[in-house]
Amino acid sequence: MSPVEPAGIMKKSHRQKSQRLWAKLVMRKWLNISGRDPEYGADTDNESENEDAREDNDDSSSDEEGGSGSRGRESKVYENAEDAIAAASAVVDAAAAAAEFISNDAPMKLRRRNSETLRAQYINNKEIRVCVGTWNVGGISPPSDLDIDDWIEINQPADIYVLGLQEIVPLNAGNILGAEDDRPVAKWEEVIREALNRVRPKLSGVKSYSDPPSPGRFKPFEETHDIIEEEVAFESDSDAGVEIHPIDEEEEEETDRLWALKHDGGVIGEVKTLVDPNTGLPVVEIKRQFSIPKKLDRQLCLRADSFKGISDDDSTQTGMKTINRMLSGKERIGLSWPEPPLNMLGPCVLDRQPSIKTVKSLKTAKSFKAYSSFKSVAGNNNGIPPEVLALAEMDLKLLMERKRRPAYVRLVSKQMVGILLTIWVKRSLRKHIQNVRVSTVGVGVMGYIGNKGAVSVSMSINQTFFCFINTHLTAGEREVDQIKRNADVHEIHKRTVFHSVSALGLPKLIYDHERIIWLGDLNYRLSSSYEKTRDLISKREWSKLLEYDQLVKEYRKGRAFDGWSEGTLHFPPTYKYQANSDEYTANDGKAPKRTPAWCDRVLSYGKGMRLVHYRRTEQKFSDHRPVTAIYMAEVEVFSARKLQRALTFTDAEIEDEGLVAVLV
């Protein structure tokens, strides 16, 4: 046998295997067979998470896996105290239910009394901002310069962005019955990522209004950790792809030669560049601007009375040069009580390897020649504290190659034919989101193909369960189409199941969740005539036009979305527009008749959600206009401090009861 024959056999075998795999994928798609744990895309950020763990000594780093085309993994259950408490609560509830079930027949010693520690005693309520957007893009791939800033409201940053797209691929026979085309997903995700990189989050910091700080004005560190981490992430890790470059020295000749160190809005000391009268060379001098009691010395991270030295040859040519630097949120953590005393900070800094992350937030306003001068002066070690020496040893030039991480990460991204649901969250919030699960339901061709249907995501944010459903329902203006849309909704509720490997009582169905948001192209139309609809639109009489809306009629009669809520429609119908135009399609007989309608909707179910506003965006990219809803949603946050206090009180009560029993 010639050497060519085995290669030909292997190539033929590989081709046959690919054909079998393609046929398997198509059959699974036709029959709407999905795995028990469906695949989805998510950002991989293990390296940065490890950096956060080393920098912040945080043991509860995120465990994200997967990527585009990879399988997202369900989060671990016992990653932090919150999950441990959730698991313990579930076990306690199960035990209580079992005790109640056998209470009639069980002996007295087997009966368990109810817990005296109420849930409200160790849970705090917190609001997060959720931006929900839906858009039918009509099968058009986005251009690289597509502007979606208004749609996602980057001027009002949210904690979570839930974005649902419909018809990301043309709904032709090849895309409906053939293998799934995921190329548009990467394009849309890139557009979304670039837009979110331009978001400037509003920072909420911890301020000290007294000097020295008053213990009563500070929250425990575990409660302020998220605020600090958010500030650090914004100052050090936002604006992905932005590199730090030296600034021209000549532009700063007119500025003062000083370096101000800030702490809670107050200047602690200043660094001046002076000229040595003996040598005529520039030197650096650090002076105290005001006196501080010795008992507060531990609050000064970078402290020195004075030091002098000779700069290098480069600095002699440019004269007096300095680096203006200001401490960012990362460095201020070490300045604020109740952090460890600073007499312990020096050895820790010297023992560690030079950290890029610690230095990169020092804002350089001069060239690296001035940095060389500072390093040369510090190298003489004339009574300079070890903290300053450690900073001098760090190579600021590495900042040139350091790129900042984005403030938002992709939590989950799932496609079914033309339906795409993608969720993005703040980096600081990611570790508080667990139990991410995905479910897909097709109700299209033959009642199972995914050209119509829903992509749903279940997750827990802190101690609260959320569910987001992106849907594309049956189209058409006939009465039978309206009935089919109602049937689609019932099928989605019936067949949406979130599987889990754990048995801790995680929600399986849509209505098992506490906060539910349903978005998408629901395709409910207006029952009014084309002429009457256009007349009411021209008069902007939205309340009268809303009386003909099929969806409003359906949930008022309880046939679909009974008990759900929606914001007031104070904007024109979102469908159907001419291409790249502000005009609705004309009823001229050349094209199928399309009466304008509010097809694109966002609904909510459950308590603890407050709608801020509900609007559409004037984006002419497709024949639909995108819709945005902003919610403030309550989440329950576990408080270890409150739980400890509650358990302490309970123990005291038990001891008192035992003492009374002994006395009796």
Curated annotation (Swiss-Prot):
Its EC number is 3.1.3.36, 3.1.3.86. Residues 35-76 are annotated as: Disordered. Residues 592-607 are annotated as: Catalytic 2. Residues 40-66 have a biased composition (Acidic residues). One of its GO terms (molecular function) is phosphatidylinositol-4,5-bisphosphate 5-phosphatase activity. The keyword Thylakoid does not apply. Residues 514-529 are annotated as: Catalytic 1. Coiled coil: none annotated. Keywords: Hydrolase. One of its GO terms (biological process) is phosphatidylinositol dephosphorylation. The keyword Hydrolase applies. It catalyses: a 1,2-diacyl-sn-glycero-3-phospho-(1D-myo-inositol-4,5-bisphosphate) + H2O = a 1,2-diacyl-sn-glycero-3-phospho-(1D-myo-inositol 4-phosphate) + phosphate; a 1,2-diacyl-sn-glycero-3-phospho-(1D-myo-inositol-3,4,5-trisphosphate) + H2O = a 1,2-diacyl-sn-glycero-3-phospho-(1D-myo-inositol-3,4-bisphosphate) + phosphate. Has phosphatase activity toward PtdIns(4,5)P2 and PtdIns(3,4,5)P3. Belongs to the inositol polyphosphate 5-phosphatase family. This is Type IV inositol polyphosphate 5-phosphatase 3. It comes from Arabidopsis thaliana.
